[in-house]
A protein has these predicted regions:
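Bacterial N-terminal signal peptides that target proteins for export
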Residues: 1-10
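Bacterial N-terminal signal peptides
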Residues: 9-19
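Immediate post-signal-peptide N-terminus of mature secreted/exported proteins
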Residues: 21-66
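Non-transmembrane, amphipathic alpha-helical segments
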Residues: 29-43, 67-74, 106-113, 129-132, ...
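A structural signal for well-ordered alpha-helices, especially hydrophobic packing surfaces
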Residues: 45, 49-52, 56-59, 86-89, ...
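Alpha-helical segments in soluble extracytoplasmic regions
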Residues: 52-96
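Long, amphipathic, charge-rich alpha-helical segments that form helical bundles/coiled-coils
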Residues: 81, 86-88, 92-129
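C-terminal amphipathic alpha-helix
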Residues: 117-167
C-alpha cells in the first residue's frame, strides 16, 4: 500500500504540474487575459535572444566541460522558450480566442489576417529553434506587434501598455 502511494504521488504531481507549462488549461472557464499572453511571448523572445548571445559567446570561448555544459543548457533554453511561444499561439490564441468566420461573415478578413500572422509567428519561433539566425526572434516580435494592432481595440492596447510598464 505504501509503495503504491510513493509511486502515485509523484506521478500525480508530474501529471498536474505539466499542465502549468501549457498556455492555458483549455477548460471552458471564461478566464482569459490576452495581454498577459502577449507579455509572456515578449519575455520568451527576450530569453531566446539572450540564449543566442550566450551560445555565440560560449562557442568562441575556450572548450571546457563547464562551457560545454552551459552551451547545452542555453541551447535547451532557446528551444524551450520557442516551444512556449508556439504553445501560447496554438493552444491559447488559435484554439480558444480567435473565432472562425465563414466566407461573407462580418470580420472574416480580420480572422484571416490574424490567423496568418499567428501562423507566421509559429514558423518564426520554429526557425528560432532550428537556427542561430538572430533575425528570427526579431521577426517574432515584429509579427507579434502586427498581431497586437489587429487583435486589440484601443482599450486592450492601453491595458497591455499599462501592465507592460508595471512589470
Amino acid at each position: 500500500m505504501k509503495i503504491r502511494n510513493i509511486i502515485a504521488i509523484p506521478i500525480t504531481i508530474i501529471a498536474f504540474g505539466l499542465n502549468i507549462m501549457t498556455a492555458h488549461c483549455q477548460v471552458p472557464c471564461g478566464i482569459y487575459d490576452d495581454a498577459v499572453r502577449i507579455i509572456q511571448i515578449r519575455e520568451h523572445v527576450t530569453t531566446i535572444e539572450k540564449a543566442m548571445k550566450q551560445i555565440d559567446q560560449l562557442i568562441n570561448d575556450e572548450t571546457s566541460a563547464q562551457n560545454m555544459n552551459q552551451l547545452v543548457r542555453w541551447i535547451n533554453t532557446k528551444e524551450e522558450h520557442a516551444t512556449f511561444i508556439q504553445s501560447i499561439i496554438a493552444d491559447y490564441f488559435l484554439a480558444q480566442r480567435i473565432k472562425p468566420k465563414q466566407n461573407n461573415e462580418p470580420g472574416r478578413q480580420q480572422y484571416v489576417d490574424q490567423t496568418l500572422l499567428l501562423q507566421q509567428i509559429i514558423v518564426a519561433a520554429m526557425k528560432s529553434k532550428q537556427t542561430m539566425d538572430k533575425s528570427e526572434p526579431g521577426l517574432v516580435s515584429i509579427l507579434l506587434n502586427q498581431f497586437v494592432e489587429l487583435y486589440f481595440d484601443e482599450h486592450g492596447k492601453n491595458h497591455l501598455n499599462t501592465i507592460q510598464k508595471g512589470k
